């Protein structure tokens, strides 16, 4: 095999590959052996027709498709390795010359991984932010727990006030015509929750059980349904009943009811620790994002469009998997959100470009700094994944993953170790 490299454009090269006549003839024989059971020639049993007779009867060209595939499957990776080329995607192959007893000559045009010119990446002036837990955050959490554990009682006297729950029947009209999805019965609406359109709930304050009222509102411009966006609407509303929330006392008994602790003081302390942990995780994410942004901005690279598209493909597959877990198809999700595949891919493009750039820069730094994944790290990560994908026998699944997904797991660990290296080397 001989290969000649021609640069077509940035990150695109054309390989001219020559496969020796002897090797192509061997590929022709391999093609014959693969297909000999398909040929029917009078006087020969099926599968026993000699190659020479098949060539005479059908022509040697009958073997070309498979023979070319066999020859390319062997010679293309060999050429990539010889020329130290790392392709991004499958090549565009064009046959230049072929024939029995002749060289197979073909070209393979392929997009390659871009070269990354690293800038400053050590000693970055970036610090991890610090977020203190405020008392108001703890109070908010406790208030939410109190609301969730409230008793709902029928309000026997008085009219609707803010914070009450109005049980209503309603029907909406636009220009005097009822619209789809604008009707409900025995709907429990907490006044002041902001559940309905702006100014809807406020117009119910002061009403009593049995009252009927025409409520006039305007749908937001970006409501999400074209036929309703920005439209004025009138709702016929009837008050069926009024309910109130009876909030539990914030004491030790409350703490026992909503958690595994015995005192209200312990409950507050646990909430504080949880918020501190959340704040630290948030700070760590922001720190990492700032470091990645800096090393990307300090580096130079031209990323091929195909790499971005492949990353978008992966993001779409991930979304589809998460939706499936929730019992939704991608088509249903797009219908609910008014999206199309093109809109979603456009929306994902910026994040996909950043992900590609981040991976390329981190890989380049890892190569420069000789950052590796140890066998211990690899096995530990495989075991973590084994517990997720093979909970009945995680150790067996871990061994399978080490064999089948080694490169992917190793890459993830190297990128994580590289990011850790960058953070440790910040000022």
Curated annotation (Swiss-Prot):
Keyword terms: Cell cycle, Cell division, Chaperone, Cytoplasm, Isomerase, Rotamase
Q: Where is the PPIase FKBP-type domain?
A: 163-248
Instruction: Give the enzyme's main class according to its UniProt record, as a single word.
Output: isomerase
Q: Gene Ontology terms, cellular component aspect?
A: cytoplasm
Q: Entry's InterPro entries?
A: PPIase_dom_sf, PPIase_FKBP_dom, Trig_fac, Trigger_fac_C, Trigger_fac_C_sf, Trigger_fac_ribosome-bd_bac, Trigger_fac_ribosome-bd_sf, Trigger_fact/SurA_dom_sf
Q: Which reaction does it catalyse?
A: [protein]-peptidylproline (omega=180) = [protein]-peptidylproline (omega=0)
Q: Which GO terms describe its molecular function?
A: peptidyl-prolyl cis-trans isomerase activity; protein folding chaperone; ribosome binding
Q: What is its EC number?
A: 5.2.1.8
Any keyword Isomerase?
A: yes
Localisation per UniProt entry: Cytoplasm
Gene Ontology biological process terms from the UniProt entry:
'de novo' cotranslational protein folding; cell division; chaperone-mediated protein folding; protein transport; protein unfolding
Q: Which residues, if any, are the signal sequence? A: none
Organism superkingdom: Bacteria
Q: What is known of its domains?
A: Consists of 3 domains; the N-terminus binds the ribosome, the middle domain has PPIase activity, while the C-terminus has intrinsic chaperone activity on its own.
| Assigned protein family | Belongs to the FKBP-type PPIase family. Tig subfamily.
Q: What does this protein do?
A: Involved in protein export. Acts as a chaperone by maintaining the newly synthesized protein in an open conformation. Functions as a peptidyl-prolyl cis-trans isomerase.
Name of this chain's protein: Trigger factor
| Species for this entry | Clostridium beijerinckii (strain ATCC 51743 / NCIMB 8052)
């Amino acid at each position: 095999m001989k290969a000649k490299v021609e640069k077509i454009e940035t990150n695109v090269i054309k390989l001219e590959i020559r496969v020796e006549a002897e090797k192509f003839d061997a590929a022709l024989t391999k093609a014959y052996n693969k297909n000999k059971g398909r040929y029917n020639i009078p006087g020969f049993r099926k599968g026993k027709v000699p190659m020479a007779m098949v060539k005479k009867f059908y022509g040697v060209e009958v073997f070309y498709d498979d023979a070319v595939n066999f020859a390319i499957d062997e010679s293309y990776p060999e050429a990539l390795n010889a020329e130290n080329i790392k392709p991004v995607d499958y090549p565009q192959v064009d046959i230049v010359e072929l024939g029995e007893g002749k060289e197979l000559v073909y070209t393979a045009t392929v997009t390659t991984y871009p070269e990354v010119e690293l800038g400053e990446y050590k000693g970055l002036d970036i610090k991890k932010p610090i977020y203190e837990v405020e008392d108001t955050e703890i109070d908010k959490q406790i208030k939410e727990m109190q609301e969730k554990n409230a008793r709902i009682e029928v309000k026997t006297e008085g009219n609707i006030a803010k914070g009450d729950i109005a049980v209503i029947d309603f029907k909406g009209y636009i220009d005097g015509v009822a619209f789809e999805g604008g009707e409900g019965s025995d709907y429990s609406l907490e006044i002041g929750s902001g559940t309905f359109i702006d100014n809807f709930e406020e117009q119910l304050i002061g009403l009593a059980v049995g009252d009927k009222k025409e409520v006039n509102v305007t749908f937001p411009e970006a409501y999400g349904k074209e036929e309703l966006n920005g439209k004025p609407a009138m709702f016929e509303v009837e008050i069926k009943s009024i309910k109130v929330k009876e909030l539990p006392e914030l004491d030790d008994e409350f703490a026992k009811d909503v958690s595994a602790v015995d005192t209200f003081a312990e409950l507050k302390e646990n909430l504080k620790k949880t918020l501190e942990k959340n704040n630290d995780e948030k700070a760590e994410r922001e720190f990492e994002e700032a470091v990645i942004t800096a090393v990307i901005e300090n580096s130079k690279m031209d990323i091929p469009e195909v790499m971005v598209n492949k990353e978008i493909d992966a993001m779409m597959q991930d979304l589809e998997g998460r939706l499936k877990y929730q019992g939704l198809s991608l088509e249903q999700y797009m219908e609910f959100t008014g999206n199309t595949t093109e809109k979603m891919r456009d929306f994902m493009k910026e994040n996909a470009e950043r992900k590609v750039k981040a991976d390329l820069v981190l890989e380049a730094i890892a190569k420069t700094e000789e950052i590796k994944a140890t066998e211990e790290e690899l096995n530990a990560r495989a075991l973590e994944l084994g517990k997720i994908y093979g909970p009945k026998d995680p150790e067996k699944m871990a061994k399978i993953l080490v064999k089948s997904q080694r490169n992917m797991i190793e890459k993830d660990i190297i990128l994580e170790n590289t990011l850790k290296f960058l953070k440790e080397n910040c000022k």
